[in-house]
UniProtKB/Swiss-Prot annotation:
It is an enzyme of class 1 (oxidoreductase). Notoamides have been shown to exhibit antitumoral activities. Notoamides A-C show moderate cytotoxicity against HeLa and L1210 cells with IC(50) values in the range of 22-52 mg/ml, but the IC(50) value of notoamide D is greater than 100 mg/ml. Moreover, notoamide C induces G2/M-cell cycle arrest at a concentration of 6.3 mg/ml. This is Short chain dehydrogenases/reductase notP'. The gene is notP'. It comes from the Eukaryota. It comes from Aspergillus versicolor. PROSITE patterns: ADH_SHORT.
Amino acid sequence: MPQTSDGNVHAPQYREAKPSQGDPSLSVSQLFRLDNRTIIITGATGFLGSTLAIAILESGADVVCLDLPPTPTAENWNDVKTTASRHEQQLSYYQLDVTDEDAVADTFAKFLPTLRYPVRGLVTCAGLSLNGPSSEFPASAFRKVLDINVTGTFLVAKATARAMISANTTGSMVFVASMSGYGANKGVDTAGYNSSKAAVHQLTRSLAAEWGSRVGLPLIRVNSLSPGYIRTAATAEALQKPGMEDQWTGDNMLYRLSRVDEFRAPVLFMLGDGSSFMTGADLRVDGGHCSW
C-alpha cells in the first residue's frame, strides 16, 4: 500500500477517482447479476448466511462458504449444494474461526488457488449475541461478542482486500450489522451486541474511506446491512418471553417480524455493480423500526 510522508492519507496526492464498477449499457435485469466472480460468505451455515449463499449462486457467482462447524449441517447445506449444481456454480466450504488471524490467512491461502473467478465480494454473516444484565455480565462474554462481531469482520475483510489488491480486481463488501447499532433493544439486555454492531457501522465507514480512492489500490466498496428483527431459530427463545413478540412487532411500521429471504435483494444490490456509487453507507432494512 502506498505510504504517505506527511501523515495525511486523504491528501489529494494520495487520492484518485477510480473507474465506476457500473456499466450504463447494462439492462436493468443485469444490475443484480454477479457473473464471473467469487463471493465469500462468513457465517454461511446460519439461516441468513445459507439463504444469501443460495441467492448469490442464483445470481451467477461462485461462492466460498466459511463457518465454525467442521462440516455444514445438512438442514441448510443441501439446498445450497443443490442450487450450486443446478446453476453450475463452484461452491466450497471451509471451517474457520473468524477471530483467529492465522487461521484466516491459512484458509485464504488454501482456497484462493482453487477459484475459477477472482474474489470480488464478501458478506460477513458471522456473529454472536449474548444477553444478560450488564451489572452481572462477564467481561469474557463481552469480549467474545466484540471479538466475533467486530474483530472477526475486520480480519476477514482485511484478507479479502489483500486478495483483491493482489489480483488488482475491484470488489464490494457487505458487513451484516444491525439496527441494534442505532439504539438499545427493548425487552432484552444486549449491551455488548448493540455496541458491537455500532462498531461495525464505523468499521464500514472507515474501510470505505481507505479503499474508495487510494492511489495504487483497486476500488473496493464497503457497505453494511442493518436488519431488523428476523424470525429465526436464533430469536425463538427471546420470542417465547411473555409479550416479546407483541413488543417487537409493535415497534416497527410494518407490524411484523422479517423473514431471512427479505434480505436477499438488499445484499445482491450492494454486492452488484448496480450500486456502483454506494460506499460507506448502511442500508437499514428494519420495517421502519428506527424511523418511528
